[in-house]
Regions:
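Noncatalytic carbohydrate-binding groove/subsite architecture in carbohydrate-active enzymes
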Residues: 1-115, 122, 126
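Short beta-strand segments at enzyme active-site cores
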Residues: 114-118, 161-164
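Aromatic-rich peripheral "rim/lid" segments of glycoside hydrolase catalytic domains that contact
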Residues: 126-189
Length: 189
């Protein structure tokens, strides 16, 4: 579709002001496992007008939990400071994922804007990220993640699309309390 849409811009069917991209996880843009470093990825990077990457340390709190939780040197902290330290590491993980994509694109000697097209934190969950899982989901952690990410992206002039404004209850049809329905900053209940 990227090539098709770029051709439509060349033909004047679409305005040249429309930016064309593909939006996917930072790993898919070459920021993680080297198995993604392929000729096809290089061709995609060359074809898009900008890269739109996703970074979700919220999911990593369960699936790749090395960064998550209280470090030994933080065990004597007050609970609030423990949480703030953990959430700072979550934001730093997003930053490192972004920088890994930048480094990969630079290694190809390609110059493209790189935006964070999706990043967010769920406020609630009753399975993997709730009380019986990583304990990542709650409103305070969501607020801290947004604050830390905004500070970093503003300081570095990086476009960040925070996912998302409103909870989407329809996303968890079989489990209304699941995390995917609770990424919104505003609860519609």
């Amino acid at each position: 579709w990227v090539e098709y849409l770029q051709k439509q811009k060349e033909l004047g069917v679409l305005s040249p002001d429309i930016w064309i991209t593909s939006s996917d996880n930072y790993e898919s843009w070459g920021g993680g496992n080297k198995s993604y470093h392929s000729d096809g990825l290089t061709q995609l990077i060359e074809a898009v007008d900008f890269l739109s990457i996703h970074t979700y340390p919220f999911h990593d709190s369960f699936y790749n939990s090395d960064y998550w939780g209280v470090l030994p040197e933080e065990e004597n902290f007050q609970k609030r400071k423990m949480i703030q330290s953990t959430m700072r590491r979550a934001a730093e993980l997003s930053e490192s994922q972004y920088k890994a994509v930048v480094n990969h694109v630079n290694s190809l000697q390609i110059s493209k804007p790189i935006h964070i097209g999706e990043s967010g934190w769920a406020s609630s969950d009753n399975v993997s990220y709730g009380a019986s899982g990583s304990k990542a989901a709650d409103e305070y952690k969501q607020q801290l993640y947004l604050t830390y990410m905004r500070e970093w992206s503003d300081q570095n002039k990086i476009t960040l699309f925070y996912f998302e404004a409103f909870d989407e209850q329809w996303k968890e049809d079989s489990n209304k309390l699941g995390s995917e329905a609770h990424f919104g900053l505003i609860n519609l209940n």
